Structures are given as structure tokens and as C-alpha cells.
């Protein structure tokens, strides 16, 4: 069905120690090839079903909040390598390959549409797709969420017209593909609207709500179901530097859920007002909304380490290992694992 597919890397068994996570926050430490290859669909299915469910993750957060030390043993998870090369659309590009993850021969098709948060969640969706015999088709573009709104890109110091063009391209692909499910996701932190020759944060929430509603309505006739995947909690300290500097303090790198500010002076934690409004917009327009903050925070705290894993890759993304660890819970919450 899909003529263009990017080359995919095999799934190694990745061994990640907390010491390494402190310095690289989610990169590969070493590979243990004595274990069965997670690239085999049957093996991957078993691995996903063995990962924690939502209640187990929530209990792990409770445990993290009361921890007196960081785990001394490395965490072992089968996670994908970095598949962004040739798949995630760069700033000046306006089309995408539509890379296929999950089960390339799957009988169902799920489209992921959004900014770098699409790539962030790929370890989970790839595993879900393999388990559920589902093709996961990626349409992602750097700093370009799926909502229909005109944004400013500070990197280019101008209106991000390439984002507008890219989103029109993806909408056309969805119309042609008629997928079973479309998942929309994007990070709101740092988003700015165009105001003359500069960007402004004023009015972002209204524009985001209207733009998300417009996108949902646009894809509804061509998708069996539309899911809006909610935003994450954003860390206040820089994850890698903080974990490296505070290896003996399990809570030095935690972030308050509300009222937090990162080291660059930007808001951090959970943007509850934004999430609540996005959920309302999604549900009012017939989409399913899936919140992810329950897997990141508890009692007004968002730990930096949960279940022995560094939660964050950087200021804007959770780590590949943590995303993969959420595969079972995310697959259940979205209804993609049955």
C-alpha cells in the first residue's frame, strides 16, 4: 500500500544505567545479543504485554516520590534506535515519506501526525503496532504541531509557512489513505503566534483550541477514529546535567507539577489549563482524548526517575526508554492494544 518506506534499524536490547542516563539521558550504552531479538513480532508482543499497566506505573510514581536513593542496577529495556533520519521532516521541508513502523504487513493503519512529540512516542507506538498487527505511519515535522494555526519559528525568525504547507500535505495523505486511526499530538511549550515581525505567546491557547478543532474536523471524514494524545509534563532542570550532578539525591531533579520554571526561565511542569481545554475541544469534536500526565506526576510532583528509568531526554521530550516502558499502558488507553 505504501510505496515509500524509510530504512529501519533493528531493535537491540539496550542496557541503560542511571549513571549513563545522567550523562546522555536516553542513549544506548551497550547491547546484549544473548537475549531473543525484540525485532521478531512474536517476541515484541510478549515484551509489550509484560510491560506495566497504568496502575502499576502510577504505583511506581508513588514509590519514586518516597525513594531514599537512586537504583544502583541498570535498567534493561528493548527500545528502538533513532529512526528520525529520513522520517522526521526538517524545518524547511514541506512533505514527508510517511515512514512505516509497527507491523509493516499489518491489516490496520494508524497515522501519527504532529511535531517531534510524534518521534518521542515512536518507541511505544512501534511496539504497540507490532503487537496489534498494525502499520504505524509517521508524519512528523520539527516544531510543527498538527493544529491548524499560523505559528512563528524563532529559529528562522519568521512565520513558519513550511508548517502550514506540511500540514496541508498530511491532510491530503490522510484523505488518500483512509486510515483506521489518526493520532494527533504536539507540545505547546514554546509555541508562538506571528505578530508582525516577531512571535508572541499572547493568544496561543485560543488559536491552539481553534486550530485543533479545525484539524479534527478535517480528518474526521477520512479516519475511522481520531485520537488526541495529550501533552507531557516538562522538566524544570536540564535532565542530563541534573542527574549527573545529583546521583546521590533521588529528588533533586524532580519538578513541581504546577508553578515550575525551567533553568531558562520558561514555564515547566504540567500545563493543566491547556490540557483541560484541549480535552474539551477533542471531545466536543468527536475525538478521543488520552491524558499522559498520570504516568508522569503524582501529588504535585513529577519525578525525574520512575521505575529505575530516567523520564526525560531533554527539556521538551521524555526519554526513549520511558516512552517504551509506557507501551502497554498507552496501547490500552488508546484502544490500540486489544
Go through the PLM ranges and name each one.
Residues 2-338:
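Extracellular/periplasmic envelope-modification machinery, especially enzymes
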Amino acid at each position: 500500500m505504501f510505496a515509500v518506506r524509510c530504512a529501519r534499524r533493528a531493535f537491540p536490547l539496550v542496557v541503560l544505567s542511571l549513571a549513563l542516563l545522567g550523562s546522555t539521558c536516553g542513549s544506548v550504552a551497550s547491547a546484549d545479543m544473548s537475549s531473543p531479538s525484540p525485532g521478531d513480532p512474536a517476541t515484541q508482543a510478549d515484551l509489550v504485554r509484560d510491560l506495566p499497566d497504568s496502575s502499576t506505573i502510577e504505583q511506581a510514581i508513588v514509590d519514586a516520590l518516597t525513594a531514599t536513593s537512586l537504583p544502583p542496577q541498570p535498567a534493561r529495556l528493548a527500545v528502538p534506535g533513532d529512526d528520525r533520519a529520513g522520517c522526521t521532516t526538517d524545518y524547511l521541508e514541506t512533505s514527508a515519506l510517511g515512514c512505516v513502523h509497527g507491523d509493516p504487513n499489518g491489516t490496520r493503519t494508524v497515522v501519527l501526525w504532529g511535531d517531534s512529540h510524534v518521534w518521542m512516542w515512536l518507541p511505544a507506538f512501534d511496539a504497540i503496532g507490532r503487537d496489534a498487527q498494525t502499520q504505524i505511519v509517521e508524519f512528523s515535522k520539527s516544531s510543527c504541531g498538527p493544529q491548524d494555526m499560523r505559528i512563528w519559528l524563532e529559529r528562522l525568525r519568521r512565520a513558519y509557512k513550511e508548517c502550514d504547507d506540511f500540514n496541508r500535505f498530511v491532510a491530503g495523505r490522510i484523505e488518500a489513505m483512509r486510515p483506521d486511526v489518526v493520532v494527533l499530538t504536539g507540545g505547546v511549550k514554546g509555541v508562538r503566534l506571528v505578530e508582525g515581525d516577531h512571535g508572541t505567546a499572547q493568544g496561543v491557547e485560543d488559536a491552539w483550541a481553534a486550530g485543533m478543532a479545525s484539524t479534527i474536523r478535517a480528518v474526521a471524514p477520512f479516519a475511522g477514529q481520531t485520537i488526541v494524545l495529550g501533552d507531557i509534563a516538562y522538566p524544570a532542570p536540564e535532565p542530563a546535567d541534573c542527574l549527573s550532578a545529583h546521583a546521590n539525591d533521588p529528588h533533586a531533579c524532580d519538578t513541581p507539577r504546577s508553578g515550575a520554571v525551567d533553568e531558562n526561565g520558561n514555564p515547566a511542569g504540567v500545563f493543566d489549563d491547556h490540557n483541560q481545554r484541549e480535552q474539551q475541544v477533542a471531545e466536543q469534536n468527536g475525538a478521543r482524548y488520552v491524558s499522559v500526565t498520570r504516568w508522569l506526576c503524582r501529588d504535585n510532583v513529577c519525578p525525574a526517575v520512575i521505575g529505575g528509568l530516567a523520564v526525560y531526554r531533554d527539556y521538551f521530550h521524555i526519554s526513549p526508554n520511558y516512552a517504551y516502558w509506557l507501551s502497554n499502558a498507552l496501547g490500552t488507553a488508546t484502544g490500540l492494544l486489544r
